[in-house]
């Protein structure tokens, strides 16, 4: 048996020879950044692929989150989830905004709409939910609350590339949706991100903000930032799109393999989507409860001892980090579900190049424990 390490994820890389022609075009144009032809082509291609009207590319998803908040002039307090990558809440603090944590739904692991309303104060200006693992939030319930209280909704959709509900792209919901194209994501540009914009006017403001606030050669209208994606990153994205169908199909097959092999394992719960969603299978999280022979951490270590490097996404909670734990909303009593899930979760390896032999190594450990 091959004992080569198996990591929780691995970037999808198309054949190198297919990337060379894109690089040759960049060398010939001598345009490396500032909205060059590759950048413009990728924005258009993503609009078509995702079924959205306007895409603003960024150099990474965190800068995109920061800029989205600036674009909507969000201030005060924003209700968000503690169960996410730290960039979600960091983007708020960097904008001088106070995160207010609300608990998550025990089934979807997304922000629980029934907990949002109680967290609203006169200082609340927005809600920032996360489509965790690419599973859509209850967008209708969240939007209803936002409408009732005149709040903005910015979705951290870092996990949700290509995800659709019955009406189309999940990215069409809220005021803005923010994507990450980091190397670990199902669609990557090495580093990168994007904001999905509802209209041309909003995209224009976002494009200005990501270019230091410039509107022309001599006019600056806002304190912007350098959030521009380079031509090399955009070119890689164009090539990646050509391979997405094959990569997504392989992820779907791996997801099905895990579900079939683990369905009889007592003490393991697989996180399911809504059932009305076109999923991207970006992660494969399981929850390890008291009926499993090993604790979550013991299973995590056993996998590691066998060369399988799963991850405890998301542990610890954002609310446990020093810059957040002193906040009233970060208290464990306010977040019982999120704390329980964080103590149980393991994400198993999932990426297109995984072989059946490697997958069987993973499932055998869970079956035999």
Give the label of every model feature segment.
Residues 56, 79, 100, 153-154, ...:
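Structural detector of well-ordered beta-strand residues that form the stable sheet scaffold
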Residues 172-208, 231-234:
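Active-site PLP attachment segment
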Residues 31, 35-77, 83, 91-94, ...:
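Phosphate-binding glycine-rich loop
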Residues 37-45, 49-55, 114, 118, ...:
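PLP-dependent aminotransferase class I/II
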Residues 61, 96, 156, 185, ...:
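Conserved G/P- and acidic residue-centered "switch" motifs that form tight phosphate/ATP-binding loops
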Residues 155-189, 216-221:
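Conserved active-site segment immediately N-terminal to the catalytic lysine
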Residues 70-148, 152-157, 164:
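PLP-dependent aminotransferase-like
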Residues 1-32, 349:
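N-terminal "arm"/small-domain region of PLP-dependent enzymes with the aminotransferase-like
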């Amino acid at each position: 048996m091959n004992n080569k390490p198996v990591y929780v994820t691995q970037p999808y890389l198309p054949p190198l020879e297919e990337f060379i022609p894109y690089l040759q075009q960049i060398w010939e144009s001598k345009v490396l950044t500032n909205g060059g032809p590759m950048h413009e082509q990728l924005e258009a291609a993503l609009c078509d692929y995702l079924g959205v009207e306007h895409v603003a590319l960024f150099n990474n998803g965190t800068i995109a989150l920061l800029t989205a908040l600036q674009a909507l002039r969000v201030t005060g307090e924003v209700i968000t989830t503690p169960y996410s990558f730290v960039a979600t809440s960091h983007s708020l603090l960097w904008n001088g905004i106070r995160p207010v944590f609300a608990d998550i739904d025990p089934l979807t692991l997304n922000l629980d709409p029934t907990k949002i309303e109680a967290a609203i104060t006169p200082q609340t200006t927005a809600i920032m939910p996360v489509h965790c693992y690419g599973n859509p939030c209850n967008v209708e319930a969240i939007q209803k609350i936002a409408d009732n209280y005149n709040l903005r909704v910015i979705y951290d959709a870092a996990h949700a590339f290509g995800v659709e509900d019955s009406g189309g792209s999940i990215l069409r919901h809220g005021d803005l949706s923010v994507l990450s194209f980091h190397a670990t994501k199902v669609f990557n540009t090495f580093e990168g991100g994007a904001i999905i914009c509802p209209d041309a006017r909003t995209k224009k403001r976002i494009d200005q903000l990501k270019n230091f606030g410039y509107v022309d050669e001599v006019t600056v209208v806002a304190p912007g930032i350098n959030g521009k994606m380079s031509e090399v990153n955009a070119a890689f994205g164009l090539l990646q799109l050509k391979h997405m169908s094959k990569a997504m199909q392989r992820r779907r097959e791996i997801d099905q393999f895990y579900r079939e092999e683990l369905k009889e394992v007592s003490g393991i719960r697989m996180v399911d989507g809504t059932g009305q969603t076109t999923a991207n299978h970006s992660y494969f999280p399981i929850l390890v409860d008291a009926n499993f022979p090993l604790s979550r951490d013991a299973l995590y270590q056993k996998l590691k001892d066998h060369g399988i490097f799963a991850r405890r996404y998301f542990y610890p909670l954002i609310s446990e980090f020093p810059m957040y734990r002193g906040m009233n909303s970060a208290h464990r009593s306010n977040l019982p579900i999120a704390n329980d899930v964080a103590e149980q979760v393991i994400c198993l390896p999932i990426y297109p190049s995984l072989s059946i032999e490697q997958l069987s190594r993973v499932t055998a450990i869970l079956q035999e424990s």
